[in-house]
């Protein structure tokens, strides 16, 4: 996009975050990154970042996930927009969050993520920003989608038995 834009009112920045659930054959996990920079340096968060001016939100979420963890996923589903004015201490930021289900794979921290790591869903560390709220909504949405067998959020092949096991894991968190 070319040109200068001048607005008479302040406007927010837009980020994307990706809640990635991973199944290892026994347990349901979630992928977190340890932040390498401020704000919340050293804290755990979901992979995500600022949307580029020339990309749509799902592509931005996939790009940030790949840059920060090395993980490529095909299917993601929009979870919602997180808009609390004070959610980011840097500036007014609106986050569009996505979620996906995949198999646990090797991940590595990259870009501004020092570490990428899978955590069991019932053993999460304290999360940066409003990511605890994001996690709770994503877990409920995952449970609902698995129960109803709806949505386009699965990246990978799972048997019906595995889907049932993952569904029951969402209920026992």
Language-model-detected regions and their locations in the chain:
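Polybasic "coupling" helices that flank or enter modular domains
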Residues: 147-173
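Short glycine-enriched, charge-decorated loop/helix-capping segments at active-site entrances
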Residues: 45-51
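Unchanged
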Residues: 51-75, 80-151
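Feature targets compositionally biased, intrinsically disordered low-complexity regions
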Residues: 2, 24, 108-109, 150, ...
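Short Pro/Gly-enriched beta-strand edge/turn motifs at strand-loop
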Residues: 1-4, 79-81
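Active-site donor-binding loop signature of nucleotide-sugar glycosyltransferases
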Residues: 35, 48, 121
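Intrinsic disorder/low-complexity signal
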Residues: 1, 16, 63, 67, ...
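N-terminal strand-loop-strand
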Residues: 2-45, 58, 73
């Amino acid at each position: 996009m070319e040109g200068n834009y001048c607005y008479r009112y302040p406007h927010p920045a837009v980020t994307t975050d990706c809640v990635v659930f991973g199944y290892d054959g026994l347990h349901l996990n979630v992928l977190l990154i340890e932040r390498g920079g401020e704000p919340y340096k050293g804290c755990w968060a979901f992979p995500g970042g600022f949307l580029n001016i020339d990309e749509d939100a799902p592509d931005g979420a996939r790009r940030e996930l790949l840059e920060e963890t090395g993980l490529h996923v095909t299917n993601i589903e929009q979870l919602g927009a997180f808009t609390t004015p004070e959610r980011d201490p840097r500036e007014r930021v609106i986050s569009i969050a996505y979620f996906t289900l995949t198999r646990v794979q090797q991940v590595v921290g990259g870009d501004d993520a020092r570490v990428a790591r899978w955590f069991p869903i019932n053993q999460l560390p304290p999360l940066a920003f409003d990511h605890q709220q994001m996690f709770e909504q994503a877990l409920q949405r995952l449970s609902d989608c698995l129960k109803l067998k709806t949505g386009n959020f699965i990246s990978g092949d799972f048997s019906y038995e595995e889907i049932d096991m993952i569904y029951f894991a969402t209920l026992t968190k």
